[in-house]
């Protein structure tokens, strides 16, 4: 049985990726500092049997990261500081997670001669799109320290492939949503915040007129993409999205139906630096890994609503 190390494996995308890998017969080791992840996100049954093991630590700690690498066959690196506003407020602190932490992981993969690394890049590297839909060939023009950090990750990964032969691919996630995304977290996406508003009967804040578009992708489909990438040999970067975008007002209508609740929308002035439209073409992901999204937008929203009512 092959073993995969997931950094940030108790978090939102990480825990779903752990579930996907466990379902495919892999053993999983999770490295997490629980600054954002939760013990409740981890499969208790798999921990009891030993198929899922936990190392509590931080990727910024080189010795801890090195120790967690021992005996693993692949690494899924998801640990990060993922708040764009936080990166703007404190770029130096953000870089310790997203550049220094990334480099600790990447270099440990090199030293331990681990055959495969998949890591979280981001659609934030593109900045304001020159044209839509976005492909991997689009020029990177990050608008935040977070986006720049992710682009630097991509450059380091490319250099390590060239210099040391480290096989890696960066997953440029678009707008991921689904169960276990904490709406109270500063990292929460718009869907989890709207879900919290619907459940709490509070107004949904929309910055601008609501015509902004986003490519929303269900976390289970992201987890499948991660699992496929770990087992593949494609390198470089891959856009991870559905190829379909919806406006925020369309999103609210769909959520009202999925949650079975009315919504009060409060329009506020447009947010500074907000990107009006975003969508990707996931053709390279489909071509190289045979991936396609299987969860419709309505199904994903219903799964989110059901998970919130179960907690």
Regions found by a protein language model. Name each.
Residues 1-174, 295:
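N-terminal Rossmann-like NAD(P)+-binding domain of SDR-like oxidoreductases, especially those catalyzing
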Residues 39, 77-80, 195, 199, ...:
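Short amphipathic alpha-helical interface segments enriched in basic and hydrophobic/aromatic residues
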Residues 63-66, 73, 85, 92, ...:
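Residues in well-ordered alpha-helical elements
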Residues 87, 137, 166, 172-182, ...:
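A conserved pocket-lining segment of Rossmann-fold NAD(P)-dependent short-chain dehydrogenase/reductase
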Residues 91, 183-184:
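Active-site loop immediately N-terminal to the catalytic Tyr-X3-Lys motif
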Residues 152, 156, 160, 190, ...:
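Hydrophobic alpha-helix immediately C-terminal to the catalytic Tyr-X-X-X-Lys motif of short-chain
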Residues 198-311:
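C-terminal substrate-binding subdomain of Rossmann-fold SDR/epimerase-dehydratase oxidoreductases
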């Amino acid at each position: 049985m092959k073993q995969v190390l997931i950094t940030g494996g108790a978090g939102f995308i990480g825990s779903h990726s752990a579930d996907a890998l466990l379902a495919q017969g892999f053993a999983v080791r999770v490295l997490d500092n629980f600054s954002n992840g939760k013990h409740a996100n981890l499969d208790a049954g798999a921990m009891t049997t030993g198929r899922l093991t936990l190392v509590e630590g931080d990727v910024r700690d080189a010795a801890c990261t090195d120790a967690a690498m021992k005996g693993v066959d692949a690494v899924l690196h998801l640990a990060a500081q993922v708040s764009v506003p936080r990166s703007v407020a404190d770029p130096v602190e953000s870089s310790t997670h997203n550049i220094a932490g990334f480099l600790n992981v990447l270099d440990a993969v090199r030293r331990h001669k681990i055959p495969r690394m998949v890591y979280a890049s981001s659609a934030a590297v593109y900045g304001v799109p020159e044209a839509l839909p976005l492909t991997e060939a689009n020029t990177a023009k990050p608008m935040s320290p977070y986006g720049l950090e992710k682009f630097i990750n991509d450059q380091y990964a490319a250099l390590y492939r060239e210099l040391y032969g480290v096989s890696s691919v960066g997953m440029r996630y678009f707008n991921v949503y689904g169960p276990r995304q904490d709406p109270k977290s500063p990292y929460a996406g718009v869907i989890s915040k709207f879900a919290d508003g619907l459940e709490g009967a509070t107004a949904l804040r929309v910055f601008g007129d609501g015509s902004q578009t986003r490519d929303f992708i269900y976390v289970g489909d992201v987890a499948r993409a991660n699992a496929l990438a770990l087992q593949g040999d494609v390198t470089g970067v891959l856009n991870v999205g559905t190829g379909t975008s919806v406006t925020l007002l369309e999103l609210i209508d769909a959520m009202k139906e999925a949650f079975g609740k009315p919504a009060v929308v409060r329009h506020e002035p447009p947010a500074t630096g907000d990107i009006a439209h975003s969508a990707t073409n996931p053709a390279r992901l489909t071509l190289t890994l045979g991936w396609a999204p299987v969860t419709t937008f309505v199904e994903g929203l219903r799964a989110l609503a059901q998970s919130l009512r179960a907690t």
